[in-house]
Amino acid sequence: MPAYAGFEMGPIRPPSEAQSLLLRLTRNCPWNRCSFCSVYKKHSFSLRPLADVLRDIDTIAGLVKALRGDPDATDIQLQQLSAAEEQACHAAGQWLRSGMESVFLQDGDSLVMKPEQLIEVLQHLRRCFPRIQRITSYARSATVARISQTHLQQMAAAGLNRIHIGLETASDTLLKMINKGTSKAQHIEAGLKIRRAGMELSEYVLTGIGGEEFSSEHARETAAALNQINPDFIRFRTLRILDGTELFPGSEQHRWQRPTDLVQAQEILLLIQQLEGITSRIKSDHMFNLLQEIDGTLPEDKQRLIDILQSFIDLPPQQRAWFQVGRRSGHFQRLSDLQLPGRRAEVEGICRRYGISPENVDAKLHAMIQEQMQRGMF
């Protein structure tokens, strides 16, 4: 077994875990074949040794004591940290400032760890930090489906209380074409198992994944699955991939066509219209999303969310283009910002300067986002 190399952190986390301590249990993704995801493509998967994960927890506990000035923190000299320890110190300091309420287990699917080992990690976290309110993790539906209900309930009892699952879509056609490695039925099975275990469940829906051809199927099939699962959160994510990415490697007949912002708004509208009998919180909490004001709880906010989407769809083409540019440039946050004369004038100026019109707005914005992605800004 390789020697302990120090505290580790993985590359990503959900936006909702911005204040969480990031604790790495695994490296990269055990599946790593989804056509739309490039995060781990150049890296192989590995499980970190249990002893290393427990040592990471002890390291953070010691650093927190030292940063607080606790008299029993005699074994850590903050001014003499090695380069490998600086990352842990930064993580401990940031977590301490945020209130030390939540922990996110990395990387892409921490539940592939042996249940007994994961439970030991959770118990050690609770022993070291008894005031933690939330411990969360990414998980794949295929992984959850293989875990016994008893083990899931034991994980929940040990403190794991929220799971983030990349549903992406519940269309079996699309799931096969994007090589997701799961099915609609398995998505439903996994979601229900998490709910029965008493954990919160966030399901992520990838808007635009079906292109224009499969937009309606994506919306309807995904809504049908969500209606059976009734997750605590439904979170929308706008698909962003580099040009040249083969999104449908599992199909010889179909090629993905990038949908416009209007098509994606219509897709989200259709999906929300199809949601019935559930009490999920809907969130659009990512910088890529055009309409971040899509935020509400079902069923009471359903009509308000529908009205927001319909308002964007019904805008005259020129105003719709202004809003698209205003959102991507940071001038607008909400549809109502179109009514602010100063901000709107600035956006109109941007459109004139760069020759942006209703006919080319999606292409122009796509080119801008592609440049930013290639520069590593996202």
Identify the function of each model-found stretch.
Residues 53, 118, 148, 187, ...:
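Aromatic/hydrophobic pocket-lining residues that form the small-molecule binding cavity
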Residues 62-196:
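Conserved SAM/AdoMet-binding glycine-rich loop
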Residues 142, 166-176, 193-218, 237-243, ...:
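Conserved strand-turn element in the central/C-terminal portion of the radical SAM core barrel
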